[in-house]
Each structure stands twice: as C-alpha cells, then as structure tokens.
C-alpha cells in the first residue's frame, strides 16, 4: 500500500480506533486505517529529514508527473548593466530573460523489512513503528548520500596547505595532504571571497559550508568562531548548524565526504616492496595476492615513495611472489621494504575530508514530499499464496531521486586533513 499524504503531528490523536465502526467480519488484518497510513508516513519523513543535510540547500523540484524519468532545473542568466541614459519621451528597447534548462534523469531507490510478528491494526504496533523509524533514517542517509556524491564531483577544489614551523607549503594533489594540512580561517575567507567575486547569491544572507565534525574540531577552536546561538534563533537554524565564520554558516554532518583507500588485500591494508626498483613499471611485493584480489587491484591508485601511481594490472602469487604492474614509469628509487599505501586518500592513505562551500542555486535536487519518498506497508494476509498462513508483513520505503550541479562556480570544496582524526577515520 502506497502512502502519500503528509499531515501535522497533532493529527496523531486520531488513532483512537473504534471497532464498532468496522464491518462485522473485520479481523484487523485486512487494511490499514487512513490515520495509521498518515502516522507511518509522517514517522518515515520525520526520521529521514534530519539526515538530508546536503539536500537542504539545493534548488528543489517536485517529482515529474507523467513526464517520464526526466526532471528539469532552471538557471537564470544575470542581466547586463543598463548604462545607456534614457531619452525623454522615448521608450527604450527592452531585454529578455534568459533561462537555461538543465535536465537530469531520476532513479528509483528503496528497501523493506519483513516482519514475522502479527501486525495489529487496532493499535500502533511498536515493532512496525520502530522499523519505520529505522527505515526513515536509512532513507534519509541514502538520499543524502546520492546528493552528496553528485555535488562532490565539483571540479572547483582547493587543497589545504601543509604547515611546518609556521611556513606554508602549497599542496596541489590530494595524495600530498598530511596531518598539518588543515582547514583554517584563512581558507574559509578565501572560499567566501571566491564566491563573492563570482557574484554568487547568498542563502538567507550568508554562504553555507557542509563540514565533517572532525574538521570542525580544528576550526571551532579559532577565537573568531561564532556558535549558532550567538547569531540566530532556534527557528532559523539549519539542520546540523554549529556556527559561523566571516559570512559563512557551517553545517555539521558525519556524512560529509571522507576519502580514504580501501585495504589493498583482505589480509593487508598496505603492501611492502620486496625488491628495489628505480625504473620500469613493475613492483614486486612481499605479501600474497590472490587471483581475485589481483583483478580488483587493476585501476587502483597507490602511494609509494613520494608519488602516486595507478596499477595497470597485478599478478597473483604467494608471499614474495606477487607483482604490481604500474601505468606510469617509476621515476624515483623505491627501496626494498618501502610501504605501498592505498592512493585514494592523503599521504600514506590518511583520511581526507571534503568541506563544501555553497551559494544559492548551486545545485538542484528532487523533493521528498509529494511522492518523492513513500512508505509502503504490506499487512499480513496481503501476499496471497506466497504467504499461505498469513505469517508475514512488511514495511519499506521507495523514493525517486536525482541531483544535479547547476552553476559550478557557486560550489567550491576544500580537501584537508584532521590533526587528530585522519589516521583513524574511515571512508564513507
């Protein structure tokens, strides 16, 4: 059964159920009352919405009805300056509004839980309610990740500089980021300046940054930091908002992107160079690599010595018999016993955190209301011969979702490490 309507939480009092109003042969397993439909749907949305941190700043569009799988976002071009003086009594030529349509294809996502307990329809069953809450959180995190992964593809990326003895060293690649390369107040000011220079519109008067708690830990210790309660009321605070710096409001989320390479084999996160290499494209390693692991290594990035390489292929073998073939020629002396790290993170595979800086209408998302996110409840007895003893019920969610970058200059990201947490954080 699909549930679409959203009603205020105060309607929960309508769950009082009068068995006298039901048909004489009503058993409690034939249908859901409208009030219970409402409750389950509200519960799902209430649990999903706090997790949609990346969605809340996008240009929202309803799910297209009857128009296939394509949704349209709109980008409006700025008007040129009107510098020509008006002539008395003469009507000047007018201009036109330039609108660019940007389309995206929607996809459907969903999940369900099978319940073996009896679904009691004369009262709200706690098991179903708890399942709906868990599903709501899962739906929110799923849809938030879909949006996050789209907008994290922005190519407007800056890397935090490394700092040693008070001297900054520019970083131009993710794999060079170390624990000293942190998000600083100066970097925040640089991002705000870039957005202002692009004439990017603010969101309710400020720009917004989505930041991981581990990165916020470093930034919040700055004396210029303002906690959220110091500049806004609880009614106007964003979901996850923690504070503000130089015209940028920071929203904290554990789903802010963390970049770190997976272990290179099932038994070892890192590999070890067996034989010194200073040319060619082959590295012999000490660890055993299975045929399945060798196939999975093709295309992976690694960090060895002081450079990043891409694995073209790997030859399986027992300990001291496996090799890696690289796409690039080895351009330095790599001595025996040098550690080979996964190369998708920072230096030596430190976790790298991506902080997004956003202006208004930087990207578009589909709404979860109006059919974007639905609760599906199947009571026991609804499966026919597939459930001959009426032993199972289910509750799940289904969503139609897409996201799209609309104006790349309005979306910036900074990749940095955390002084305390980059060694232990995991990719998400």
Language model: regions and residue ranges:
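Hydrophobic alpha-helical segments involved in membrane association or supramolecular assembly
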Residues: 73, 133, 137, 209, ...
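Beta-strand elements of well-folded, non-transmembrane domains
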Residues: 77, 117, 399-403
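N-terminal "assembly arms/tails" that initiate or stabilize quaternary assembly
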Residues: 2-105, 411
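Sequence/fold signature of self-assembling virion shell proteins
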Residues: 16-57, 170-190, 216-316, 321-428
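Alpha-helical scaffold segments that mediate packing/assembly in large oligomeric complexes
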Residues: 119-197, 214, 275-278
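A generic local secondary-structure boundary/capping motif
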Residues: 61-62, 195-200, 238-240, 384
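Structured, hydrophobic secondary-structure cores that serve as assembly/anchoring elements
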Residues: 67, 107-123, 127, 192-221
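Short acidic, glycine/tyrosine-flanked loop/strand segments centered on an H-E-D-like triad
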Residues: 95-123, 360, 365-366, 370-371
């Amino acid at each position: 059964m699909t549930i679409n309507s959203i009603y205020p939480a105060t309607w929960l009092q309508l769950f009082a159920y009068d068995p006298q109003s039901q048909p004489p042969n009503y058993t409690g397993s034939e249908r859901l009352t409208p009030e219970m439909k409402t409750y389950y749907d509200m519960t799902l949305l209430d649990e999903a919405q706090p997790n949609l941190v990346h969605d809340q700043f996008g240009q929202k569009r309803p799910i297209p009805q009857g128009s296939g799988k394509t949704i349209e976002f709109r980008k409006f071009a700025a008007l040129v300056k009107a510098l020509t003086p008006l002539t008395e009594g003469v009507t000047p030529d007018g201009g036109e509004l330039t609108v660019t349509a940007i389309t995206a294809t929607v996809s459907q996502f969903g999940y369900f839980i099978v319940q073996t307990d009896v679904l009691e329809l004369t009262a709200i069953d706690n098991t179903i309610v708890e399942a709906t809450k868990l599903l709501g959180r899962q739906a929110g995190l799923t849809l938030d990740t879909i949006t996050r992964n789209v907008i994290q593809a922005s190519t407007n990326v800056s890397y935090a500089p490394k700092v040693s003895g008070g001297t900054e060293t520019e970083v131009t690649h993710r794999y060079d980021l170390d624990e000293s390369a942190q998000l600083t107040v100066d970097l925040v000011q640089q991002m705000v300046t870039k957005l202002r220079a692009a004439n990017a519109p603010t969101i309710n008067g400020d720009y917004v940054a989505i930041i991981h708690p581990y990165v916020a830990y470093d930034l919040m210790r700055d004396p210029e930091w303002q906690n959220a309660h110091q500049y806004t009321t609880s009614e106007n605070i964003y979901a996850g908002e923690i504070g503000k710096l130089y015209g940028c409001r920071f929203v904290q989320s554990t789903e802010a992107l963390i970049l770190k390479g997976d272990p290179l084999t099932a038994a070892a996160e890192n590999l070890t160079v067996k034989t010194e290499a200073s040319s060619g494209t082959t590295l012999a390693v000490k660890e055993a690599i299975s045929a399945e692991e060798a196939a999975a290594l093709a295309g992976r990035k690694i960090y060895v010595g002081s450079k990043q390489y891409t694995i073209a292929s790997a030859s399986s073998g027992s300990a001291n018999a496996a090799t890696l073939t690289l796409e690039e020629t080895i351009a330095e002396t790599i001595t025996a016993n040098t550690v080979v790290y996964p190369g998708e993170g920072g230096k030596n595979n430190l976790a790298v955190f991506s902080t997004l800086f956003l202006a208004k209408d930087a990207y578009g998302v589909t709404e979860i209301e109006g059919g974007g996110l639905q609760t599906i409840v199947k009571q026991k007895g609804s499966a026919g011969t597939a459930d001959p003893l009426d032993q199972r019920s289910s509750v799940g969610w289904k969503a139609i979702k897409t996201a799209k970058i609309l104006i790349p200059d309005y979306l910036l990201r900074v990749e940095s490490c955390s002084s305390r947490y980059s060694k232990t954080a995991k990719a998400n």
